[in-house]
Curated annotation (Swiss-Prot):
Heterodimer of LeuC and LeuD. Catalyzes the isomerization between 2-isopropylmalate and 3-isopropylmalate, via the formation of 2-isopropylmaleate. Keywords: Amino-acid biosynthesis, Branched-chain amino acid biosynthesis, Leucine biosynthesis, Lyase. It comes from Pyrobaculum islandicum (strain DSM 4184 / JCM 9189 / GEO3). This is 3-isopropylmalate dehydratase small subunit.
């Protein structure tokens, strides 16, 4: 499962309240949630998110357990999230809604804003196409990979019928 896109880079400890502020949790439409993704730290995020790969530091998605955080990123058009580490609940929520995620140590030191990336979820690496550097991460395998390939948990469960 390979994904290509340009990098949008953020730092450490981006919590779910930043990814989608609580005042927008009344909405269920992914497109509306996407219009407000990352609003507290980057009001321009929705304009640059379509077709992008979000790159972040440590503890991405920490804080409140809200699946709307992953839904908002996907609704904004983010193709994948690559981070040095994830809050476990965000990681699983992303997989369950079909948003590819990959843990890659030190990724923020090796990728700059706007650089093109190729992310291989199944084999666990990123290639910075601007520099040619292959950056190793933790592959997604087994059931989580099957869920991602199906487009999320709902589609995966439907495929079992």
């Amino acid at each position: 499962m390979k994904i290509r896109g340009r990098a949008i880079v953020y730092g450490d400890k981006i919590d779910t309240d930043v990814i989608i502020p609580a005042k927008y949790l009344v909405y269920t439409d992914p497109n509306i949630l996407g219009q407000h993704a990352m609003e507290p730290i980057d009001p321009e995020f929705p304009k640059k998110a379509k077709g992008a790969i979000l790159v972040a530091g440590r503890a991405f998605g920490m804080g409140s357990s809200r699946e709307q955080a992953a839904i908002a990123l996907k609704g904004a058009g983010v193709l994948a999230v690559v981070a040095e580490s994830f809050a476990r609940i965000f990681f699983r929520n992303a997989i369950n809604i079909g948003l590819p995620v990959l843990q890659v140590p030190e990724i923020t030191k090796k990728v700059k804003e706007g650089e093109e990336l190729e992310v291989d979820i199944e084999n666990g690496y990123c290639i910075n196409l601007a520099t040619g550097e292959k950056i190793e991460g933790k592959p997604i395998r087994g059931l989580p990979l099957a869920i991602l390939k199906a487009g999320g948990l709902t589609n995966y469960l439907k495929s079992l019928r």
